[in-house]
Amino acid sequence: MKREKAIIRQLISEKKRFEKIKEGDVMAGKDDFGTTKYIIHAEFEANGVVERPDVVGAIFGQTEGLLGDDLDLRELQKTGRIGRIKVEVHTKAGKSYGTILVPSSLDRVETAIIAAALETIDRVGPCEAKIRVVKIEDVRASKRKYIIERAKEILETLIEEEIPETQELVEEVRKAVREMELIEYGPEKLPAGPHVPFSDSIIVVEGRADVLNLLRHGIKNAIAVEGTSIPETIIKLSKERIVTAFTDGDRGGELILKELLQVADIDYVARAPEGKEVEELTKKEIIKALRSKVPAEEVYNELFNKGKSFYEIVREREGKVKEEPQEKAETQPKQQVKVNEKIVKPLPVIKQDYKGFEEFVERVKNSPDPVALLLDENKNIIAEVHTRDLLNAIEENDGVYAIVFNGIITQRLIDVVSEKGVRYLIGAKKANVVRRPITLKVITFAD
């Protein structure tokens, strides 16, 4: 029983392969026709019921001695110049029909002679029969066609797959580098950029993906809140650093912003464009958003007391900036008259001196990175350095008249600059300042 099943399976397999060969898929039969040059395709019809051995016997028997010893089919098959003859037989209405495949490694002329010899067969077994050669297939041409078509497929696959793989490889390397730069900060192990531990200013974002996106574009002082509950680490940092809250442009981002403004000491607020998330922003969009940051006091009042959205506040602010030059021209003379009527006090003098530094204050305020400008008496820039290198820059440069930076003014910094004869120290805000030399004017952005 098992043997019969195995034979049936083999016959079915051979039948399928034979059908493919018959349809022109020569490569399906390459195991049988490995060294074949040509395949003779023939059809036969017998007036009676015959089987495969009858057809094969008729081919060998009736061509024997017909073409001489050199083209005798038995001899050619022994030497491998004629392959195994494939015969497919089916019976209908008392007649037998079928196909014959004769593999040949002879040349074209000899193969054509063999094909013509097949048509001389007039009996198969006890029945009259007729064989007709349908075609002689050039296997090498079929192989060449197969090679061309397959090569096209392989090339298309390479073109489709190779480029994405290269891009994926580059992106994987970049991602690995960014993740290596990513640190865990505080007891809550918040995802943060490598500059957060020592930077005077930090950017608070929503999640790990936001920090990674900012890292990709060179901003390394971001830290994530990782959820709607603001961690104690963020609250503590907000009391010591200049903090910019940078949230998504959706409702979730607005909710986190409101909570940050309530529990932390936020200095500035920036938002992603409406409907976008920080993690998907391009470098240009990130820089634009950070440059458009709004003081937290202004946002707090409008957001909670007047119920306005952040984007309404920004649009109103931009409108006021456009109207400001005209209003200034109209109102300035009146203000000057009022000042002249009052007794001159030190405060207006300091305010007047601060006005001369407005250009530099705006420059450092709009910078996405912590930066310090060292100016001479003529207000020319002597050096522009990262705030972490400020103390070294003060020691290395003489003739520093004023320092403008977007960092925190500390007592240590005041002591160092006063020893170097600096007259103006302008920063974002002060922290724990207990003494100040008379010769040094300490001014914050709020002043």
Swiss-Prot record:
GO terms for molecular function: DNA-directed RNA polymerase activity; metal ion binding; poly(A) binding. InterPro entries: DnaG_primase, Primase_DnaG_arc, TOPRIM_DnaG/twinkle, TOPRIM_dom. Pfam families: Toprim_4. Binds two Mg(2+) per subunit. Keywords: DNA replication, DNA-directed RNA polymerase, Exosome, Magnesium, Metal-binding, Nucleotidyltransferase, Primosome, Transcription, Transferase. Residues 200-274 form the Toprim domain. Belongs to the archaeal DnaG primase family. This is DNA primase DnaG. It comes from Pyrococcus horikoshii (strain ATCC 700860 / DSM 12428 / JCM 9974 / NBRC 100139 / OT-3). The gene is dnaG.
